[in-house]
């Protein structure tokens, strides 16, 4: 969902950094539109969305996310730091949440776009943390989601790094066929 937010923000480059198959860190960095400080705090509230103003807007949605639940749900079970800046702002902002509690908001130097770090997933819900599968299984899920989003937007560059090692470095592609070749190899794309 973090990648989908980046795509929805108009990013043309999205980087995903994962440590320990996502248990320790999931970080998504983009060069999209970013958020102003008020929206950066508001986005962590349940059902907060900038995509629906009237009921008619539901028929016009062309984005991945619109319900305004993902960031609130993530912030409930992890330590989250969001850095963001819009084009017109000189200084960005940093917002910190843990276990649904708003810990801090402050100004920070950051590039245009959004950088969100999710640390210590399920640290406050030990029973849920126990249900995580092995690192291999959890990382396979990360790769599946990364691939799913990368396939939907071949014109966007995507990078996936795990434990300091680049897994995928996908440059913007001319078409879905070229993106499939980058992800799965030329033999699969021919089929």
Where are these regions (language model features)?
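N-terminal phosphate-binding caps/lids of nucleotide- and nucleic-acid-binding domains
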Residues: 1-191
